[in-house]
C-alpha cells in the first residue's frame, strides 16, 4: 500500500511539472498539490495504524516473560521553531518510550538497565527486535527504548521533528533518566546503552555527551561519518538531511554541521566508556568505510578502552548479527558478554544454548 501511494505521489508530481509549463493551469496545479499532500498524510496515517497493531504484537511475543509498558515523556524543545512566536513554541517535545521489565523481578532488588535506541533515519522500535529484547529480559535486564523525535508511527508532526545527531540524543538519555526517577528497581549505577545502525550512532553520541551516565556501550554497524555518507548515498537520501529544520542545508553547503553530527569526527569527546563496535564488509546500508574511519579516529586520538570486530562478508549484510541463524546468535552472545562484564545481570547467558532457549523457546 505504501509503495502504491509513493507511485501516485510521483505521478502527481510529474503532472504538476507538465502543467506548470502551460498557461491558465494554476488552479489545477493547486488541486494536484492538495491531492499529493493528502496522499502524504495518508501514508503517515497508515504508519500510525501499523504502529498500533505492532504494539499489540509485543504482548503476544514477550508477555510471557516481561511486564510491558509504554509511557509518554518529554525531551528538549525543538532546536528550530517554524514559528518562534506561535502558540506552544518552545515547549518540550513529547514522545513515547517502551519499557520491558522481567516478570520475575523482585521489587526489593535492583536490576541493570539497557537503553536501546532504534535505527533510522526515520523508523521506530518495533517487533523486529523481538528476539533481542527477549534475550535481554531473560538475563534480568530492564530495557527501555525511546521513540525519539522523527520516529515513524506517530503522524507527520512527529516525523518532521527529526533532528539527526542533534536533540534526539537528549531524547534517548531522557528515557534513561525517566527510568531512574520512576522505578526503584533500576540500579542507576548499572546502566548501559546498545544499538544498531542509527541506534548505534545514538549510542556513540550518548557516551560522548554523557559519559557519566553509562557504564558500557555497544554500537553495531553505526552510522559514523555523515560527510562520507552523503557522498555514497543518492539525492533522495541526502534530502532527508538537508530538509531537516535543524540542519537546513546539504553537506557541501555546511560541512561544519555535518562534521559536528558525525561520531568519527567527534572522538575527542570519548571518555573511555567500555565500548564494543561491530561492522561488516558487505553492509549495504552503512558502508564499512564509515566505521573504519571511526575506528581509525579512535586510535589516532590514543583512545584505549574500546574493542571492535570487522566481520567479513557475513550473511545478512547490515542486519548480520540481528538475524536468526546460529552464527548471528553466537555473535550476539559476544555482545552480551561485553555488556554483562560491566552490568552484572542476575542471569547472564553462559552459552549460545542459553540464548537459544531464552529467545526462541527451545534449544
Model regions and ranges:
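Cap/lid segment of the alpha/beta-hydrolase catalytic domain
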Residues: 62-95, 103-189, 196, 231
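Active-site-proximal cap/loop segments of hydrolase catalytic domains
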Residues: 77, 148-363
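Extracellular/periplasmic ectodomains of large secreted or surface enzymes and adhesion receptors
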Residues: 23, 57-89, 99, 337-363
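N-terminal targeting or regulatory segments adjacent to alpha/beta-hydrolase or S9 domains
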Residues: 13, 19-69, 359-363
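Sec-dependent N-terminal signal peptides
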Residues: 4-13
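Generic structural signal for residues in well-ordered beta-strands
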Residues: 97, 143, 306-308
Amino acid at each position: 500500500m505504501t509503495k502504491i501511494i509513493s507511485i501516485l505521489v510521483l505521478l502527481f508530481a510529474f503532472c504538476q511539472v507538465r502543467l506548470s509549463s502551460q498557461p491558465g493551469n494554476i488552479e489545477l496545479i493547486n488541486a494536484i498539490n492538495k491531492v499529493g499532500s493528502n496522499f502524504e498524510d495518508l501514508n503517515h496515517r497508515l504508519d500510525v495504524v501499523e504502529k498500533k497493531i505492532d504494539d499489540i504484537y509485543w504482548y503476544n511475543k514477550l508477555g510471557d516473560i516481561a511486564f510491558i509498558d509504554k509511557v509518554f515523556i518529554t525531551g528538549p524543545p525543538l532546536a528550530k521553531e517554524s514559528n518562534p512566536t506561535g502558540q506552544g513554541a518552545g515547549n518540550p517535545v513529547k514522545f513515547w518510550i517502551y519499557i520491558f521489565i522481567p516478570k520475575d523481578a523482585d521489587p526489593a532488588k535492583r536490576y541493570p538497565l539497557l537503553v536501546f535506541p532504534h535505527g533510522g533515519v526515520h523508523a521506530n522500535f518495533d517487533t523486529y527486535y523481538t528476539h533481542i529484547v527477549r534475550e535481554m529480559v531473560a538475563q534480568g535486564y530492564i530495557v527501555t527504548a525511546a521513540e525519539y523525535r522523527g520516529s515513524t508511527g506517530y503522524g507527520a508532526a512527529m516525523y518532521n521533528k527529526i533532528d539527526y545527531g542533534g536533540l534526539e540524543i537528549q531524547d534517548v538519555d531522557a528515557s534513561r533518566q525517566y527510568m531512574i526517577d520512576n522505578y526503584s528497581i533500576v540500579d542507576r549505577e548499572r546502566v548501559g546503552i546498545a544499538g544498531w545502525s542509527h541506534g548505534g550512532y545514538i549510542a556513540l553520541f550518548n557516551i560522548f555527551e554523557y559519559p557519566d551516565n553509562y557504564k558500557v556501550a555497544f554500537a553495531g554497524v553505526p552510522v559514523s561519518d555523515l560527510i562520507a555518507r552523503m557522498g555514497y548515498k543518492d539525492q533522495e537520501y541526502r534530502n532527508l538531511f538537508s530538509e531537516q529544520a535543524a540542519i537546513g542545508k546539504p553537506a557541501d553547503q555546511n560541512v561544519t554541521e555535518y562534521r559536528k553530527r558525525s561520531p568519527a569526527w567527534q572522538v575527542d569527546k570519548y571518555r573511555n566508556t567500555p565500548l564494543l563496535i561491530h561492522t561488516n564488509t558487505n553492509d549495504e546500508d552503512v558502508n564499512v568505510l564509515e566505521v573504519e574511519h571511526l575506528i581509525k579516529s579512535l586510535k589516532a586520538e590514543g583512545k584505549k578502552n574500546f574493542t571492535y570486530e570487522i566481520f567479513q562478508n557475513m550473511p545478512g549484510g547490515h542486519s548480520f548479527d540481528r538475524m536468526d541463524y546460529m552464527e548471528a546468535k553466537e555473535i550476539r552472545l559476544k555482545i552480551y558478554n561485553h555488556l554483562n562484564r560491566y552490568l552484572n545481570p542476575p542471569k547472564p547467558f553462559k552459552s549460545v544454548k542459553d540464548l537459544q532457549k531464552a529467545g526462541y523457546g527451545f534449544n
